[in-house]
Amino acid sequence: MSDMFRKSVLNKLPHLPPTRAPWADESEPIEEIDEEDEQLDGIGEFKPATMGPSKHDTQDYSPLSASTFFAQAAEVQPPSTPCTFRVYLTPPNLSIASTNAGTPPGPSGLRTQQQTNRHGTYLVCHHGGGASGLGFAPLAREVKAKGNGEMGVLAFDCRGHGKTSTSDPNLELDLSHDTLLSDFMAIIEMMFPDPKESPSLILLGHSMGAAPVVSAAPELQKKGYTIPGVVVLDVVEGTAVESLPLMKSVLSKRPESFRSVIDAIYWHVTSNSIRNVESARVSVPHIIVPAPSSSSSDPSANPGGKQVWRTNLVGTEPYWEGWYKGLSQRFLRTKCARLLVLAGQERLDRELMVGQMQGKFQLEVMSDVGHYLHEDNPAGLAATLITFWHRNTRVLVLPPKIGAPGPGARGGPVEVKQVGQQ
């Protein structure tokens, strides 16, 4: 790896501020932040923190409830995995989708028709390493708003992350490509067991999450699921593989712990790790856990005090290369619409550059966002996703030839396969 490339990557890293928040004072007692009992829908809420910012900082850094962004949550335990996954979802509004299926004719007299699945369409999101499903919370709300509720959203905490638990703690760090793929497939098949009765699924993966998502698309199509498109967020194989030697250095610059949940939210915002305060308030509480107290080995014994990282990313180092090797080739080979969204002018590797020139995928570049672009600008990404979905599920309705009977005159309507079906 060249020194020029190494310096360019390091220069992109944010200048990390001190871990302690500016209002922290050793002489003042710290009140605990109690977590409310989880409701039947499985979404936990946090009470607003009583420890407020200084008089010079009026920004609210208190945690937000996931119920503000998702309609429901569930604990999913596929029999093929040792994990119980926390799944968040907002179902599509099927009545709205059915009424918006067609468009008026254009100047040429032709019209397009939206291909509709009577079971709706879901955007299925897989987060990156160290994140959680709630990183997609603001995006889920924006997709619902901008898509008039026609598209549902499903996100989850993958193995070793967020609220997902593993029966064998030794398997928490098994984040190999094959394991992530197996877990992802198991969740889909658990949530939508019958491919014929399943909604259409647009698969989206951020960073590490792109690996299982891209690999799952052809496997799900073989099983009969309809996959109209695959979306990859801010990861390019060539750049990712070249950056791996720097990952330990990047991780070592993070604080090892935080004094409180609010301290963690504040750090993520001021370090520019997450540039959207609202998103940080809902996602950060789920990527940290209470540190075990000196008198107890139970991490939940001190919920309002010192916080540590939920996921030991350094422990997953053996799997880093496996996430990204061959990603570009698999992405270009998927038999559905493809969308790559990058943060800033990220350089494409050779395969993606050739693929772009051949028109094999749609490329969108978002400005003024960081690596967590879905958190930094959820409204902008939601608009891109809705347009991508509509563009790739519309079909041209041709008028019948003059004097020829319509399609319903003989043998009923013409059958057209859904986009993404094989």
From Swiss-Prot:
It catalyses: [phosphatase 2A protein]-C-terminal L-leucine methyl ester + H2O = [phosphatase 2A protein]-C-terminal L-leucine + methanol + H(+). Its EC number is 3.1.1.89. Residues 1-27 are annotated as: Disordered. Keywords: Hydrolase, Serine esterase. SUPFAM superfamilies: alpha/beta-Hydrolases. Transmembrane segments: none annotated. Gene3D superfamilies: alpha/beta hydrolase. The active site is at S207, D234, H371. GO terms for molecular function: protein C-terminal methylesterase activity. Demethylates proteins that have been reversibly carboxymethylated. Demethylates the phosphatase PP2A catalytic subunit. Belongs to the AB hydrolase superfamily. This is Protein phosphatase methylesterase 1. The gene is PPE1.
